Amino acid sequence: MALLEIKNLSTEFKTEQGSVQAVRDVSLSLKEGEVLGIVGESGSGKSQTMFSLMGLLADNGRVTEGTITFDGQDISPKNFKNKREYDKFMRKIRGNTMTMIFQDPMTFLNQVLKVETQLIEPLMNHKDISKTEARKIALELMRKVGIPSPEKRINQYPFEFSGGMRQRIIIAIALACNPKLIIADEPTTALDVTIQAQVLELIDSLREESDSSIIMITHDLGVVAKLCDRVAIMYGGKIVETGTDDEIFYSPKHPYTLGLLSCVANPEDDDEEVLHPIPGSPPDLLDPPKGCPFVDRCEKAMRICKDHMPELTEFSPTHQCRCWLNHEKAVK
């Protein structure tokens, strides 16, 4: 059964220059206990898709089309009478059944509030428990995520922790209410390589211990290979390919997916390896392409790619791609 179903989601932002079409007709599903990786360059729409889901869009952003069904309930903004009613509902589930691990703990954590205050806040907001009980749970969460001496450190401030330990606090806050869905938005971006590996090991072990479903937003295909069951490749505000991790890594279909893979070094390859960066820049979403969003950077682009958005081609029940190269209707 799908825990999350996003259908034809579009999100825009009003700016002085015009409307930015940040998310365009995105459809995704997530099963209970599954880990889905969303991969793409900066500005591809990964984070804004998740902010649309969680009701965390900036004031100039709005969902213009589509539906979002979470845990059997339609939580699309249009399903509510007004924004006030929608925001009130989202506050009830955000931090409770649906949580987010943000990429920059220094920004997310309040530097003038003790860790205890920030750890027990979701528990006090969403659970009918006393402050003493909430503190006990907070201490156990700190132990669970590998923070030493929790009885001492719970009384400290975030700035007294290292970057890796601050990220562990973020993870503990996300886990506080045993959420059904955890969204991890580039959770290792601000960390050095050694600490990145430790945090990923932690997320992997917590995944095995809980029933939570996870959406991992990243540009790092190594993270995807390690943690994810399925992968969605995003470019120019659109999902261009989805598949299992094996299908994406061993049988990629979209030229953008192939381009991403060609940028990754293979540590098992003894020969000198030449990496091939993708030429060009992502499309301007103030004026997105009429056809395929990747057309201006694609070495295999055809005339139809410029004028018509590719239809979805299905290679298996789990593997779909939007590319004219693989479509039976394409005029070569």
Predicted features along the sequence, with ranges:
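Charged, flexible cofactor/metal-binding loops and thiol motifs
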Residues: 244-332
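Conserved ABC ATPase "signature" region
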Residues: 73-74, 132-152, 261-262
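ABC ATPase NBD coupling module
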Residues: 75-99, 125, 247-252, 283-289
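A short, flexible loop at the N-terminus of ABC-type nucleotide-binding domains that lies
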Residues: 3, 12-25, 56-62, 78-90, ...
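Conserved ABC transporter NBD signature motif
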Residues: 63-77
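A short, proline-enriched helix->beta-strand linker immediately N-terminal to the Walker B motif
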Residues: 176-180
